[in-house]
């Protein structure tokens, strides 16, 4: 009843906040699933990588896998593909080979970072502006309630209270949209940062392996 009785502007504010809240919750659950999958895949690939498997065999497994390769597997695939390509070229020194592989892995890492950070900016935006949008709706609703009092000769609390209550719902909805978004953003930003550090550490370790391998002709590891 309070929502239905609010002014059109306040109702529009409530609708926008409701949409923002629904989208935020959807992104929060999707991000939780995606990050959980990314951590699981990274751990599984790292176990396979450090199990002593031949790099050439591992590369064939990764490149032959169905679907798009993500995470550590994507970084490994990009680096080893460039490493193998440069080693086949005559006149290319070991340092150039390793630097080329490292650049390819950095590009792959950048793509993975972009994928991990998807939707975080939206959560940050919702968390920062929703309270102000709700406050705008509240201020507008209170102004409308007091303007309505100008048409009566004797104002009472009972006449203005419903309008103020309707307006305050906008603030409550703004907080309802903002709080989960802020919590989700802070939590997932921390998780993404840890994953990025994990990826970067693996990249540096793999570069060290490639540096040793680049100086041994005809080896794969």
Walk through the language-model features, giving the residues of each.
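Hydrophobic alpha-helical transmembrane segments and adjacent short intramembrane/lumenal linkers
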Residues: 153-167
